[in-house]
Amino acid sequence: MANPLYQKHIISINDLSRDDLNLVLATAAKLKANPQPELLKHKVIASCFFEASTRTRLSFETSMHRLGASVVGFSDSANTSLGKKGETLADTISVISTYVDAIVMRHPQEGAARLATEFSGQVPVLNAGDGSNQHPTQTLLDLFTIQETQGRLDNLHIAMVGDLKYGRTVHSLTQALAKFSGNRFYFIAPDALAMPQYILDMLDEKGMAWSPHGSIEEVMADVDILYMTRVQKERLDPSEYANVKAQFVLRASDLNGARENMKVLHPLPRIDEITTDVDKTPHAWYFQQAGNGIFARQALLALVLNSELSL
């Protein structure tokens, strides 16, 4: 049947309705269970990373290859005409779009991915991260992992820990989970890195329950998902960072009293906010979460590049 995501730009998680999200996640589950190595056999996809990336770039490019697509692109703009000759982003995208069927793009500037859609013609642009703004495919793999481990995306208790002010992953994930009913949010962060007011206002408008907390221990017994993030040293003065760093570290001993099926997630890279002894517990799920990026990104590529998709 025809799908609503065909040739659609995916720049923000808000570009996807609840039905769209369910379609992507259902497609991801099918591709995980039944690989389709020739689904995009005659497609060419540009992987345009204007800033360095490890997991996102490798995950996207692996997804492309495993669906049979041809991949062109670059992992650093320094050696492109844009980096060396001063070509504009508009011209770069205008040219690349004449070569390929889709563009996957990461850029350090907020709004760059949305700008690219103005110059890509009918070629869909998939945002792989634009500054501290949006990272929709990270949110898709987060949702896929939550649904896979909890069996649902509604009536969940979700704690988010660390840098909630600048962390684009927690902004997008909160916006996505707010599309599903009955979810409750616990925000655990220092005052200087608290969740932005616009996110809290959005939750209030939707009638979603949320509360701020000063420690992980306060909520451990109540949550289904503990979503950890890295507190960035450069965001705080040295004395405050030392306090915060110690306060927002998860250790295996902190998991005593957690719900049996509670999962710890993290967008990675992890520095020292999750100690390695957590890795050995059944709650640790961040490496499986990263692996699910393959299937979430495969699903999105398959949907934007096929007017009809039957798996």
Swiss-Prot record:
Pathway: Pyrimidine metabolism; UMP biosynthesis via de novo pathway; (S)-dihydroorotate from bicarbonate: step 2/3. One of its GO terms (biological process) is 'de novo' UMP biosynthetic process. It is an enzyme of class 2 (transferase). One of its GO terms (molecular function) is amino acid binding. InterPro entries: Asp/Orn_carbamoyltranf_P-bd (IPR006132), Asp/Orn_carbamoylTrfase (IPR006130), Asp/Orn_carbamoylTrfase_sf (IPR036901), Asp_carbamoyltransf (IPR002082), Asp_carbamoyltransf_Asp/Orn-bd (IPR006131). Its EC number is 2.1.3.2. Carbamoyl phosphate binds at R55, T56, R106, H135, Q138, L268, P269. The keyword Lyase does not apply. It catalyses: carbamoyl phosphate + L-aspartate = N-carbamoyl-L-aspartate + phosphate + H(+). GO terms for cellular component: cytosol. L-aspartate binds at K85, R168, R230. Coiled coil: none annotated. It comes from the Bacteria. Keywords: Pyrimidine biosynthesis, Transferase. It holds the Pfam family OTCace. Belongs to the aspartate/ornithine carbamoyltransferase superfamily. ATCase family. HAMAP family: Asp_carb_tr. Heterododecamer (2C3:3R2) of six catalytic PyrB chains organized as two trimers (C3), and six regulatory PyrI chains organized as three dimers (R2). Catalyzes the condensation of carbamoyl phosphate and aspartate to form carbamoyl aspartate and inorganic phosphate, the committed step in the de novo pyrimidine nucleotide biosynthesis pathway. This is Aspartate carbamoyltransferase catalytic subunit. It comes from Salmonella paratyphi C (strain RKS4594). The gene is pyrB.
